[in-house]
Each structure stands twice: as C-alpha cells, then as structure tokens.
C-alpha cells in the first residue's frame, strides 16, 4: 500500500476508532480538552471553537504530521498523531496524544496506540515506532512501558512549554520484530480493522 493513502484510513478496534483528523472534530475535541489534559503538552490548550479549528488546521498543515481523532462510540475523546515518517530509516513516531479525562484509565489510550502500532508495522511497513514524552509525565511513561516500549534515553531541553520553561523528554521505541513476537504489549492478532 502506498504510505500516503495508508494515513487516510480509519483504524477501528473493538472499543474505538481513529479517524483522520478533520475540522468536524473541533467541537468534540474542545469538549474533551481541559488544563489538566494539556498539562504536559508543549502547546497551550485551545480555549474556544475558533482556537480548536486553528489548532486542527495547523495539525493538518504540517508535512511531518498525520493526525487522527480518537472516537469512542460517536464521541470525540481526543487525538493522536503519526510524526516524522522516515522511509529511508524505516521509522515513524507516534505522539501528540491526548484524551479527555473521562477516558483516563479506561484502556482507550492503549487501544489507540495498539491500533497505530499495528498499522505502522503491518500496513505502512515501518520497522521502528518511536515515542517521546515529558519526563514529568509519569502517567504517559507508565503507559508506554505497559505497551512494551523500551526507554531509549533522555533529551534535555527538548521542547519549550507554553509557560516558557523547557521540557526534558524521555524517548521510547518498539521494533517491528518485537511487536510481531508479542513483546510490544499486544499479540500479533488483536482484531484490528483497517477500514476506509
């Protein structure tokens, strides 16, 4: 499958689906967002429907990002993105993931990540998926470790925060061979549907 086409697919699992991000997701994302959700993100929380639409437009406008809305039932619960697809090195990053607090601790983040991992490895053909998170975000670090991601290192002063301080980031990764063996926190067949 051609990679660009692969980024336009809806990814469906048993509890949620990932839809390519669109302007129509703005109201749902705004309802899911609050200051605690955005506490460890390197950009400010959009506080109005106009700001959320601008945020979506910016997310869609960058050549290095392929964003998705996380949809549970018919409710937009959050977002996650593929970043920096590098076909030469065979790697891609998953990041800019956030969910409304209502879905914290429900398994939605893990399911979304597993859908994205399966799609990156099996449909898009990448050999490595990387992640990075704020060193201060213990919840995110634990979630990545439960997925089976390895801690690759710490990068100091990696991203400026909205308050002007600098974020140190912990880098993680999972290799395709580990994922296929089930070392990546998910058995090879998890009922993932690569819908249209």
Label each residue range with its predicted role:
Residues 1-108, 119, 123, 128-129, ...:
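GNAT-family acyltransferases
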Residues 16-18, 144-147:
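Generic leucine side-chain signal with a strong bias for well-ordered alpha-helical environments
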Residues 105-119, 142, 146:
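Conserved acetyl-CoA-binding loop-helix of GNAT-fold acetyltransferases
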Residues 93, 111, 128, 139, ...:
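Amphipathic alpha-helical recognition patches that constitute DNA-binding helices
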Residues 145-155:
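Conserved acetyl-CoA-binding loop of GNAT-fold acetyltransferases
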Residues 131-141:
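Conserved beta-strand-loop-alpha-helix junction that forms the acyl-donor binding cleft
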Residues 27, 141-142:
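Alpha-helical elements of the RecA-like P-loop NTPase motor core of helicases
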